[in-house]
Amino acid sequence: MIAYPCPMLKYVNYDIVFQEFPDEVTLAINLSCCPNGCIGCHSAYLRGDVGEELTWERLLALTESYAGNITCVSLMGGDNDPASVLELLARLKKHYAGKLKTGWYSGRTWEPSAESLRESLDYLKLGPYLAALGPLNSRDTNQRFYRVNPKGELEDETFRFWK
């Protein structure tokens, strides 16, 4: 757990990835200030208060710089300010009016309301990393991958990661 407040969303880096969300070419933006402190986390550097503020303008600029090359934008982390994550992704989803999907990878176990899900997300990955249970490609994992249907309901598709 971090011992200092992180009053805003900050991004450290980003990359184009092909396996975070099945069948998507994703702009994955890594957010810092992670409060979860998962032992064995592959991105422990994201626990610190580092990076630049992720504003709507910056998110839009990053997204537009990859226009035509991506099918999805995902925020990786942001558990220090889930409301801001959902707000930014809702704006992005509305701005692109179905032409670009959105996803969120959260280390928490809670689920946003159906309305928030419907307005903000196409995909949601939930759950802290627990080394004894393995990552998403392990059948024993506690983490879950969901597709958000048009009603805002979560459809568990974790099996798509299993080997």
Placement of each model-derived feature along the sequence:
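Catalytic cores of alpha/beta
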Residues: 112-118
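A short, N-terminal amphipathic alpha-helix
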Residues: 58-66
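Short cysteine-rich clusters marking metal-coordination/redox-active sites
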Residues: 38
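N-terminal [4Fe-4S]-dependent radical SAM core
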Residues: 1-30, 35, 43-48
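Charged phosphate-binding loop/patch that engages nucleotide di/tri-phosphates or the phosphate backbone
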Residues: 149-163
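Flexible, charged surface loops at secondary-structure boundaries
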Residues: 22-23, 65-69, 119
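Conserved nucleotide-cofactor-binding alpha/beta core module
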Residues: 82, 86-93
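Core AdoMet radical
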Residues: 42-54, 68-83, 98-111, 123-148
